[in-house]
Amino acid sequence: MLRLPTVFRQMRPVSRVLAPHLTRAYAKDVKFGADARALMLQGVDLLADAVAVTMGPKGRTVIIEQSWGSPKVTKDGVTVAKSIDLKDKYKNIGAKLVQDVANNTNEEAGDGTTTATVLARSIAKEGFEKISKGANPVEIRRGVMLAVDAVIAELKKQSKPVTTPEEIAQVATISANGDKEIGNIISDAMKKVGRKGVITVKDGKTLNDELEIIEGMKFDRGYISPYFINTSKGQKCEFQDAYVLLSEKKISSIQSIVPALEIANAHRKPLVIIAEDVDGEALSTLVLNRLKVGLQVVAVKAPGFGDNRKNQLKDMAIATGGAVFGEEGLTLNLEDVQPHDLGKVGEVIVTKDDAMLLKGKGDKAQIEKRIQEIIEQLDVTTSEYEKEKLNERLAKLSDGVAVLKVGGTSDVEVNEKKDRVTDALNATRAAVEEGIVLGGGCALLRCIPALDSLTPANEDQKIGIEIIKRTLKIPAMTIAKNAGVEGSLIVEKIMQSSSEVGYDAMAGDFVNMVEKGIIDPTKVVRTALLDAAGVASLLTTAEVVVTEIPKEEKDPGMGAMGGMGGGMGGGMF
């Protein structure tokens, strides 16, 4: 009989054979100094070259293979950056760090990702070069950040607020690669729903772009039964000046809604019932009365699920001046309904797919209070899904929703255009937030003289400031290069011209950028520079890079299979 220690001694080697990953992780590959930096820089260059071709009005598109469906055609910098994954792990680390720059800029400003990428490449490249000659990377980073702070302060001085719809259209047009139609449609949308209104972008069903304004509270639930239809045209139910009964619970008994029907009848008003569901006896009686005596009523399921449904019903109650029955903490019963418990709306339109409550008669102060509550929730939530739902609710309570429907002849065309529309929309919002500066890379060029007055603490910090001076020329040079002209000559000529003169790459001429409407949002330029400098200067301080060496998989069990086959053969003979 074996003792326990002997058994354990026999088991230990077995566990190592069966589960090597439990005892040891992947092996690592380590590179130091110039070797590591050179490989990372190759990755940075590859990504930046791919992104840079999209810059400016004469920038080209990039075609990206997708794991499913047609290839994606895009001129959006962040989409190109995200698609790049390099085989060499050291090159990939460099590429991924610059990819982060594009992502951060996109999340914060919604545009300017190409500018951020070319700026990051320039700072990293120059930084690596100086470090190889013995400069101190930490002091270079300090010099870079010192210069960036000075540039941002100068950008704020140059910035002008956006005041007219024309300026909004100009910002959107530039960001949409010179497409005036997109610029005008975004300007119209902002005019109609307000500068802080919700604007969403969707695939259209036609060849042309369309703008749909949804005012009031629209939600994606239609009538429960088609027998509620009261218009022959359009298969919908329409009422003017109606009462609204809101319930969190299912309504099955007709007795529970008779009091509400009597109130509506006494006041000669139609009744809209919005509940978790209306079924059984309640639904059949409503339909029967609708058909026999022309009862003006429609039943609709409440939108959303769980907490989202509760919140939307509460929003409807506040917007219409009613109450929600079945709400936790309230002792309201449907049988005890009073006229002041019913919401009031000027117009109701219900189709088989959606319902719209227009001109709600809710108390303005209560609506404003509810809007503030939603804004506060927006500030603290981190979930993208939650933010989307809160924004939708906010729009329904405030100025309504503008839907931009992007048209085109194929999915590929619509998707490419949708990228540009989204960029243009983000740029426009950024411009409204922080104002505008000269476009075409000119704003950064006009900041170069401000760096002359800086006093660095040492020579290495001075090198960092010089790196930023040269980097600020890169966006204008890239735009010129993509237009087929010599970038350095264009930059020199802009620097010698008056403050508002820049290069119009589309026309191939030097023009007054403000008069021509070639402008950029201050927030986009500021964010692009700040994100690029932060990541790229940190990249230059790296001395060691550690990557994993993937474990080579051995052929699983082919030998055993062969043995098994032999055994079977032997058994059969």
UniProtKB/Swiss-Prot annotation:
Residues bearing the modification N6-succinyllysine: K31, K82, K125, K133, K191, K202, K205, K218, K236, K250, K301, K352, K396, K481
Span of the transit peptide along the chain: 1-26
Any GO BP annotation: mitochondrial unfolded protein response
Classification via Gene3D superfamilies: GroEL (3.50.7.10), GroEL-like equatorial domain (1.10.560.10), TCP-1-like chaperonin intermediate domain (3.30.260.10)
SS bond partners: none
Residue(s) carrying N6-acetyllysine: 75, 82, 87, 91, 125, 130, 133, 156, 191, 202, 205, 218, 236, 249-250, 269, 292, 314, 352, 359, 389, 396, 469, 481
Keyword Isomerase: yes
Known catalytic reactions: ATP + H2O + a folded polypeptide = ADP + phosphate + an unfolded polypeptide
Modified residues annotated as Phosphoserine in this record: S67, S70, S410, S488
Modification sites for N6-malonyllysine: K133
Keywords: Acetylation, ATP-binding, Chaperone, Disease variant, Hereditary spastic paraplegia, Host-virus interaction, Isomerase, Isopeptide bond, Leukodystrophy, Mitochondrion, Neurodegeneration, Nucleotide-binding, Phosphoprotein, Transit peptide, Ubl conjugation
Any one Gene Ontology molecular-function term assigned to this protein's record: DNA replication origin binding
Domain of life the protein comes from: Eukaryota
GO cellular component, one term: cell surface
Keyword Transit peptide attached: yes
EC number per UniProt: 5.6.1.7
Modified residues (Phosphotyrosine): Y90
Cross-link position per record: Glycyl lysine isopeptide (Lys-Gly) (interchain with G-Cter in SUMO2): K551
Pfam families, sorted: Cpn60_TCP1 (PF00118)
Assigned protein family: Belongs to the chaperonin (HSP60) family.
Chain's role: Chaperonin implicated in mitochondrial protein import and macromolecular assembly. Together with Hsp10, facilitates the correct folding of imported proteins. May also prevent misfolding and promote the refolding and proper assembly of unfolded polypeptides generated under stress conditions in the mitochondrial matrix. The functional units of these chaperonins consist of heptameric rings of the large subunit Hsp60, which function as a back-to-back double ring.
Disease involvement: Spastic paraplegia 13, autosomal dominant: A form of spastic paraplegia, a neurodegenerative disorder characterized by a slow, gradual, progressive weakness and spasticity of the lower limbs. Rate of progression and the severity of symptoms are quite variable. Initial symptoms may include difficulty with balance, weakness and stiffness in the legs, muscle spasms, and dragging the toes when walking. In some forms of the disorder, bladder symptoms (such as incontinence) may appear, or the weakness and stiffness may spread to other parts of the body.
Quaternary context: Homoheptamer arranged in a ring structure. The functional units of these chaperonins consist of heptameric rings of the large subunit Hsp60, which function as a back-to-back double ring. Interacts with 2 heptameric Hsp10 rings to form the symmetrical football complex. Interacts with HRAS. Interacts with ATAD3A. Interacts with ETFBKMT and EEF1AKMT3. Interacts with MFHAS1. (Microbial infection) Interacts with hepatitis B virus/HBV protein X.
Entry protein name: 60 kDa heat shock protein, mitochondrial
Protein species of origin: Homo sapiens (Human)
